[in-house]
Regions:
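DNA major-groove recognition helix of helix-turn-helix/homeodomain DNA-binding modules
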Residues: 25, 46-63
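A short, Lys/Arg-rich alpha-helix, primarily the initiator
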Residues: 1-12, 53
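Short basic helix-loop element that most often maps to the first helix and adjoining turn
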Residues: 7-20, 81-83
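Residues in the recognition helix of alpha-helical DNA-binding motifs
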Residues: 10, 24, 35
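Residue-level recognition of specific faces of alpha-helices
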Residues: 6, 31-34, 76
Length: 86
Protein backbone atom coordinates (compact mmCIF):
# COMPACT_ATOMS: atom_id res chain seq x y z
CA UNK A 1 0.00 0.00 0.00
CA UNK A 2 2.59 2.60 1.13
CA UNK A 3 6.14 2.44 2.45
CA UNK A 4 7.82 4.46 5.19
CA UNK A 5 10.09 6.21 2.66
CA UNK A 6 7.04 7.08 0.52
CA UNK A 7 5.37 8.69 3.53
CA UNK A 8 8.44 10.80 4.29
CA UNK A 9 8.77 11.81 0.63
CA UNK A 10 5.08 12.72 0.45
CA UNK A 11 5.40 14.96 3.50
CA UNK A 12 8.47 16.60 1.98
CA UNK A 13 6.59 17.33 -1.26
CA UNK A 14 3.79 18.91 0.74
CA UNK A 15 6.17 20.79 3.04
CA UNK A 16 4.49 19.50 6.20
CA UNK A 17 5.85 17.91 9.36
CA UNK A 18 4.71 14.77 11.16
CA UNK A 19 2.42 16.75 13.44
CA UNK A 20 0.61 18.33 10.47
CA UNK A 21 0.17 14.96 8.73
CA UNK A 22 -1.16 13.44 11.95
CA UNK A 23 -3.71 16.27 12.21
CA UNK A 24 -4.76 15.91 8.56
CA UNK A 25 -5.22 12.17 8.99
CA UNK A 26 -6.79 12.22 12.44
CA UNK A 27 -4.13 9.95 13.97
CA UNK A 28 -1.47 10.49 16.63
CA UNK A 29 2.07 11.73 15.99
CA UNK A 30 3.53 8.47 17.41
CA UNK A 31 1.44 6.58 14.84
CA UNK A 32 3.01 8.62 12.02
CA UNK A 33 6.47 8.10 13.55
CA UNK A 34 6.00 4.32 13.71
CA UNK A 35 4.72 4.18 10.13
CA UNK A 36 7.59 6.27 8.77
CA UNK A 37 10.17 4.17 10.66
CA UNK A 38 9.10 1.12 8.65
CA UNK A 39 11.79 0.26 6.06
CA UNK A 40 9.30 -1.42 3.72
CA UNK A 41 5.55 -1.61 3.36
CA UNK A 42 3.89 -0.04 6.39
CA UNK A 43 2.08 -2.53 8.57
CA UNK A 44 -0.33 -1.68 11.33
CA UNK A 45 -3.93 -0.88 12.02
CA UNK A 46 -5.56 -0.77 8.60
CA UNK A 47 -7.92 2.02 9.66
CA UNK A 48 -5.03 4.31 10.62
CA UNK A 49 -3.11 3.44 7.48
CA UNK A 50 -6.15 4.19 5.32
CA UNK A 51 -6.64 7.56 7.04
CA UNK A 52 -3.02 8.55 6.33
CA UNK A 53 -3.14 7.48 2.67
CA UNK A 54 -6.45 9.31 2.13
CA UNK A 55 -5.10 12.45 3.83
CA UNK A 56 -2.04 12.47 1.57
CA UNK A 57 -4.21 11.98 -1.52
CA UNK A 58 -6.59 14.80 -0.45
CA UNK A 59 -3.56 17.05 0.02
CA UNK A 60 -2.50 16.42 -3.59
CA UNK A 61 -0.03 13.54 -3.42
CA UNK A 62 -0.21 10.63 -5.83
CA UNK A 63 1.32 7.39 -4.59
CA UNK A 64 3.17 5.44 -7.26
CA UNK A 65 3.05 1.68 -6.79
CA UNK A 66 5.31 -0.95 -8.29
CA UNK A 67 2.97 -1.50 -11.25
CA UNK A 68 2.23 2.17 -11.96
CA UNK A 69 3.13 3.64 -15.32
CA UNK A 70 6.22 5.75 -14.72
CA UNK A 71 9.47 6.65 -16.47
CA UNK A 72 11.43 4.87 -13.73
CA UNK A 73 10.58 1.64 -12.02
CA UNK A 74 9.72 1.22 -8.37
CA UNK A 75 7.58 3.00 -5.84
CA UNK A 76 7.47 6.74 -5.37
CA UNK A 77 5.30 9.81 -4.92
CA UNK A 78 4.45 12.82 -7.03
CA UNK A 79 2.17 15.81 -6.82
CA UNK A 80 -1.06 15.53 -8.76
CA UNK A 81 -1.41 17.99 -11.61
CA UNK A 82 -4.33 20.36 -11.69
CA UNK A 83 -7.02 19.71 -14.31
CA UNK A 84 -5.89 21.24 -17.58
CA UNK A 85 -2.30 21.42 -16.33
CA UNK A 86 0.78 20.00 -18.07
Amino acid sequence: MITGPQMRAARALLGIDQRALAALAGVSVPTIQRMEASPGTVRGVIGSLTKVVEALERAGVELIGDEAISQASGRGVRLKTAPGGP
